[in-house]
A protein has these predicted regions:
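C-terminal accessory module of base-excision DNA glycosylases/AP lyases that mediates lesion recognition
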Residues: 1-52, 126-135, 143-266
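Short, amphipathic alpha-helical segments that act as regulatory/interfacial helices
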Residues: 59-67, 82, 131-139, 220, ...
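Structure-specific DNA junction-binding interface
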Residues: 1-123
Length: 266
């Protein structure tokens, strides 16, 4: 098992953040502008958040696996997809939960408002089943405050929580559940996906035996070492790993050059 100290975690974070800032500046993104990436996308700890906000995040996170964002395209086709499925806000979670996948898939195929094809049936079935399961779970809550309280509040951190949620939602694994939580504003969670796992392995913080739960704890420890949310640590590494400054117009190849630069400095 890989070992590390608090000082090593702080050193890696400082190097990573400085590295990202430098590369961002080369593309015209200032340190101040970079900070916008450290804000959760669907923060429910704001005055106007509702359970609809939570469901929208579910529908987005459900597609955040391998190639599915290029199939579902929920971020670009949200209105078309919801219209095709007959879903309107405020969502009626009890009614949505009564659906079955084949019925919803047929609605998509028959809709004139939804121009994208559904030839990737397996991906759509996974996504639609998740949409049904998540509606069933949300139907247990009367309001957003009940939902937030059930998860322990904005600054909570309990790896058992994403584990329990993932069992309620079909094909919603541990990493996707963490993605869902962090983008809702539960800022002490990160997403232990392939990008983060490969990054930590390259930095010799993990090995092939390290679990997703352990990756989650390492990122939390690194965040604590510099007094920032785990969300921020996650996003720094994610931006380096994916090359995707999605709130700006440029993309960069950063992960390998970052790892090489850090290891060279040691």
């Amino acid at each position: 098992m890989a070992t590390y100290t608090k000082n090593q975690l702080k050193q890696i974070y400082d190097f990573a953040y400085a590295y990202l800032q430098k590369r961002a500046q080369q593309q015209g993104i200032s340190p101040h502008e970079l900070e916008k990436y450290f804000n959760p996308l669907n923060n429910i700890f704001t005055p106007n958040a509702t359970l609809d906000t939570v469901y929208d995040r579910f529908l987005m996170s459900l597609q955040n696996r391998s190639y599915m964002p290029n199939v579902i395209k929920y971020d670009n086709n949200k209105d078309k997809i919801l219209s095709a499925l007959g879903l309107k806000t405020p969502y009626n979670f009890q009614e949505i939960a009564k659906n079955d996948v084949e019925r919803l898939l047929t609605k998509l195929k028959n809709s004139k408002n939804f121009s994208d094809n559904t030839k990737f049936k397996k991906s759509w079935k996974i996504w639609l089943q998740g949409a049904i399961d998540s509606a069933k779970w949300l139907s247990e809550f009367n309001n957003i405050e009940e939902f937030k309280s059930s998860l322990g509040g904005q600054h909570s951190f309990n790896p058992d929580i994403p584990q329990k949620i993932s069992k309620k939602i079909t094909s919603f694994g541990f990493a996707l559940t963490c993605d869902f939580l962090k983008e809702l504003g539960f800022i002490n969670y990160s997403k232990p996906d392939v990008h983060l796992i490969n990054m930590l392995k390259g930095l010799k913080l993990t090995d092939k035996h390290t679990s997703e739960q352990e990756v989650l704890r390492i990122i939390k420890e690194m965040a604590d070492s510099v007094n920032v949310p785990a969300y921020q640590v996650d996003k720094i590494f994610w931006l380096i790993a994916t090359e995707n400054f999605y709130l700006d117009s440029n993309k960069h190849s950063l992960r390998e050059t970052f790892i090489q630069s850090y290891n060279k400095e040691k």
